[in-house]
């Protein structure tokens, strides 16, 4: 619980960093990128990690941040349209094949992760093609594998990008099936398939585990405590 409070406090500081002197701002941003974001990742707090990284990026490399944010904003309408062209038929295909689907939605890529891809591949933004992501939430683990089979039957996957983090969870407890397929206009789509419980763990990591263990059950109590944690953040 102490770690959660520390991370929430750091996130609050990063959101208000503009009011601090430049030297202190740089120090805090670097510390956030190098220490607090990896800490959030270690405890499975993926949404916290992503926001900390983006905020650190904003202050440590402001020119690159502004340029990338502008490009992402300019292409948002086209990305949303293309994501819909993939998500709608994907959900329809799953339901037609009897998969119990709770949600199919676009998953935005964070600026820092896009920037790191550009750096690693030495390519500009308009040549990074795996920027599209979709999340599929289903009823249970068998439905995860059922959904994966249906998706691979309808869209061609990249074999080297299929990952089973359900059978082999990450060290922070993260579980999902990952695949990358060719969607509309030959665009690559990264697809995550998970249950709602896996989604809670992916978003809130140790917080979800701590609350679940404390309550000894899920349901309304779990949701109530996670709502508290969201409010803290």
Task: Tell where the protein language model's regions lie, with residue ranges.
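Nucleic-acid processing machinery
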Residues: 1-3, 10-233
């Amino acid at each position: 619980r102490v770690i959660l409070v520390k991370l929430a406090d750091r996130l609050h500081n990063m959101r208000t960093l503009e009011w601090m002197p430049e030297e202190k701002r740089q120090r805090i941003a670097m510390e956030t990128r190098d220490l607090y974001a990896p800490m959030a990742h270690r405890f499975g707090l993926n949404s916290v990690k992503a926001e900390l990284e983006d905020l650190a990026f904003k202050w440590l490399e402001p020119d690159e941040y502004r340029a990338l944010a502008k490009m992402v904003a300019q292409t948002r309408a086209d990305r949303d349209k293309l994501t819909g062209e993939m998500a709608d038929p994907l959900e329809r295909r799953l339901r037609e094949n009897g998969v119990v689907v709770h949600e199919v939605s676009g998953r935005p890529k964070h600026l820092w992760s896009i920037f790191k891809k550009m750096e690693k591949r030495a390519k500009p933004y308009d040549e990074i093609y795996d920027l599209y992501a979709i999340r599929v939430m289903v009823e249970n683990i068998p439905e995860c594998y059922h959904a994966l089979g249906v998706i691979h039957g309808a869209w061609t996957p990249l074999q080297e990008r299929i990952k089973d983090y359900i059978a082999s969870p990450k060290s922070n407890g993260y579980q999902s099936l990952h695949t990358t397929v060719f969607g509309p206009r030959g665009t690559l789509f990264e697809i995550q398939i998970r249950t709602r419980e896996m989604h809670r763990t992916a978003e809130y990591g140790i917080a979800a585990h701590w609350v679940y263990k404390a309550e000894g059950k899920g349901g309304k109590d779990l949701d109530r405590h996670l709502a508290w944690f969201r409010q803290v953040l």
